[in-house]
Structures are given as C-alpha cells and as structure tokens.
Amino acid sequence: MIQTETRLKVADNSGARELLVIRVMGGSKRKTGNIGDIVVAAVKQATPGGVVKKGDVVKAVIVRTKSGARREDGSYIKFDENAAVIINADKSPRGTRIFGPVARELREGDFMKIVSLAPEVL
C-alpha cells in the first residue's frame, strides 16, 4: 500500500534514485495505491548527469511493494522494498533499463514495455 509521503526507490536508469509520492492517481478520494498504479512524485535524490533532476515532479508506476498484492488464485506476492519506474505521458519508461524483478500485474495495465525490459517477471 503506497500512500502520500511514501518514499519509493527508483527501479530504472532515468537518473532519479528516490521519489516522494505526492498523489495516487485515480480519483479525488483515492488514498492508497498498489502494484500497477500510477503516482505523481517528486524526485528527492538524483544522480548527476541523469535525465531527471532533484526537485522534478514526475509520474511513476509502482512495480514492487512491501505490503504485497493479492492475485486471482488467492496467493500473495511481496517484495523487500517499495519501488517505481518513472514513465512518460504515453506510459513508456523514461529510462532504458529496469533493475530488479517486477510483478506480473503490470501486464494488465498497458506497461508491456516495462515488462519486456525487466530482467525478471514474478
């Protein structure tokens, strides 16, 4: 469960290292997001020479959560960290590489480019 003020690790090479969630997209009353949801976030840490800079406001899709997500068969998938991938307006990733595994739930949300770049899909 990702909510406002949650800090996320960045799982791509866009130049950002850490994000602070400003808003979970999908309605004015929406409080929390899970894997596959889009958030608006501010870049809190960035590497020098990256595409995004510290202080930039970006959109990102959640790819890993500690709290986990329930699947159709009743099983749950949990990860060791909360992570996101920075995306453009057309839902394509801003970076060219994805680090770490991503959840299978991203296939249903038009994020096939992220799934194809990921080294492992769980």
UniProtKB/Swiss-Prot annotation:
Q: Which SMART domains match?
A: Ribosomal_L14 (SM01374)
Record flagged with keyword Nuclease: no
UniProt similarity note: Belongs to the universal ribosomal protein uL14 family.
The record's InterPro entries line, in alphabetical order, gives: Ribosomal_uL14, Ribosomal_uL14_bac-type, Ribosomal_uL14_CS, Ribosomal_uL14_sf
Subunit notes for this chain? Part of the 50S ribosomal subunit. Forms a cluster with proteins L3 and L19. In the 70S ribosome, L14 and L19 interact and together make contacts with the 16S rRNA in bridges B5 and B8.
Keywords tagged on the record:
Ribonucleoprotein, Ribosomal protein, RNA-binding, rRNA-binding
Q: Which gene encodes it?
A: rplN
GO MF annotation terms: large ribosomal subunit rRNA binding; structural constituent of ribosome
A GO BP term here is: translation
Q: Which domain of life is it from?
A: Bacteria
Q: What does this protein do?
A: Binds to 23S rRNA. Forms part of two intersubunit bridges in the 70S ribosome.
Q: Name one GO cellular component term.
A: cytosolic large ribosomal subunit
Would you tell me the protein name for this molecule?
Large ribosomal subunit protein uL14
SUPFAM superfamilies, sorted? Ribosomal protein L14
Q: What Pfam family is a match for this entry? A: Ribosomal_L14
Any keyword Ribosomal protein?
A: yes
Which CDD domains does its entry note?
A: Ribosomal_uL14
